[in-house]
């Protein structure tokens, strides 16, 4: 069942997936699940409070793990598994869709004109590729913050038989394919704290991270075959 879900949605079965969380909620708190009228992410909730509409963009919908990555419709198998009905979810719109006409209270609270346009956009990973110009199928974007990810934009869904990659629909015949890593910059922080000689840093009066970067720069690509699994 998991392989079929992944093949349909492009989202690996993982605790971070909203589909997985909804399934847990259904099993652990069935009464709460039964009382819920709608299920929303932060963005669709904000648009509801600002404009009175219940919508989100296709990329966020794809990230739920319940959107069929090929057809762009809600996946029947995923919905049946969670017990969620399509009408309980936000309407899926293009990321370039604009909302104009803020509710009076919202416009007043933000002190902006009610006709200020708001655009739905996309999830952060897709927009990071756009931001660095990695929107061609032969260009890869690597993002390293606290966590990390490698992503490429394609013109068709890419499904990995081993479920190592995610594949999210973005918009207008584009998909983002990649792999996440829960450790990125924090691994560098850990390495500096545990591997850099504190006395050397103190004696040289230099920043520990600068010292680490100097050492790293002297090591050839591939680090002589060293593998590190954070």
Regions found by a protein language model. Name each.
Residues 2-10, 14, 20-55, 60, ...:
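Active-site core segments that coordinate phosphate-bearing ligands/cofactors
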């Amino acid at each position: 069942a998991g392989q079929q879900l992944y093949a349909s949605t492009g989202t690996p079965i993982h605790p971070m997936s909203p589909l997985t969380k909804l399934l847990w909620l259904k099993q652990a708190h069935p009464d709460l699940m039964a009382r819920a009228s709608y299920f929303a992410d932060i963005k669709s909730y904000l648009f509801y409070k600002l404009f009175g509409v219940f919508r989100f963009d296709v990329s966020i919908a794809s990230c739920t793990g319940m959107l069929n990555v090929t057809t762009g419709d809600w996946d029947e198998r995923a919905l049946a598994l969670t017990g969620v009905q399509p009408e309980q979810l936000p309407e899926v719109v293009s990321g370039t869709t604009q909302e104009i006409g803020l509710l009076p209270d919202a416009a007043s609270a933000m002190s902006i004109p009610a006709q200020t346009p708001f655009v739905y956009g996309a999830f952060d990973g897709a927009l990071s590729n756009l931001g660095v110009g990695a929107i061609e199928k032969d260009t890869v974007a690597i993002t390293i913050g606290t966590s990390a990810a490698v992503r490429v934009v394609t013109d068709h869904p890419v499904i990995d038989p081993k479920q190592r990659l995610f594949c999210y629909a973005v918009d207008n015949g584009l998909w983002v394919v990649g792999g996440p890593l829960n450790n990125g910059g924090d691994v560098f922080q850990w390495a500096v704290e545990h591997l850099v000689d504190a006395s050397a840093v103190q004696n040289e009066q230099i920043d520990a991270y600068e010292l680490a970067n100097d050492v790293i720069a002297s090591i050839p690509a591939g680090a002589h075959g060293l593998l590190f699994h954070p």
